[in-house]
Amino acid sequence: MKLIVGMTGATCAPLGVALLQALREMPNVETHLVMSKWAKTTIELETPYSARDVAALADFSHNPADQAAIISSGSFRTDGMIVIPCSMKTLAGIRAGYADGLVGRAADVVLKEGRKLVLVPREMPLSTIHLENMLALSRMGVAMVPPMPAFYNHPETVDDIVHHVVARVLDQFGLEHPHARRWQGLPQARNFSQENE
């Protein structure tokens, strides 16, 4: 499997780092990373890593200004792309087909080729413009996976919440996260079901 990972300047850089760390442990997945200029700034603000450290997690890292990179062409076959986190500027550009920079161009290629595009949009609160852009992209087949925490799995650390979001992103490609804690039903419902088998 070949996946493109785009990181933009929105907050939640730890999600992108954790995704790359998880994919690094999957020998059958080849990753192509592109970080926007502001993604690099956000990474260094929100994580203990440098942009160089994060780039090293991917099999290939591409210059965000390089519109001639291999991921900018549909003839380079991939299984899809994840933009994590996805800023509202990037999301709006993807919706409009405004391929400004390599993140936008790679997403545009994935869309035109009918491949899977997963966006992890990060903004709060959401304006009508944001919601309409997400709805339009959803109607095009783009998967919206906002980084919303779950509490049924009783997270004890920020990492637990991050792993849960990353696991839900990986689910979009049928990939299993080793730290995923999945819903098992309510305890009383499980007991009732077992008693009535």
Swiss-Prot record:
- Note one Pfam family from the annotation: Flavoprotein
Alphabetized InterPro entries for the sequence: Flavin_trans-like, Flavoprotein, UbiX-like, UbiX_pad_YclB
| Keyword Chloroplast among record annotations | no
- Which of UniProt's keywords are assigned here? Flavoprotein, FMN, Prenyltransferase, Transferase
Phosphoprotein found in the keyword field: no
Provide any one GO MF term from the record: carboxy-lyase activity
Residues that bind FMN:
9-11, 36, 87-90, 122
Q: Which reaction does it catalyse?
A: dimethylallyl phosphate + FMNH2 = prenylated FMNH2 + phosphate
Q: Give the EC number.
A: 2.5.1.129
Q: Which NCBIfam families match?
A: PRK06029.1, ubiX_pad, VdcB
Family the entry assigns: Belongs to the UbiX/PAD1 family. YclB subfamily.
Q: Quaternary arrangement and interactors, per the entry?
A: Homododecamer.
What the protein does comes down to: Flavin prenyltransferase that catalyzes the synthesis of the prenylated FMN cofactor (prenyl-FMN) for phenolic acid decarboxylase C. Involved in the decarboxylation and detoxification of phenolic derivatives under both aerobic and anaerobic conditions.
Identification of the protein by name: Probable UbiX-like flavin prenyltransferase
UniProt lists the gene as ecdB
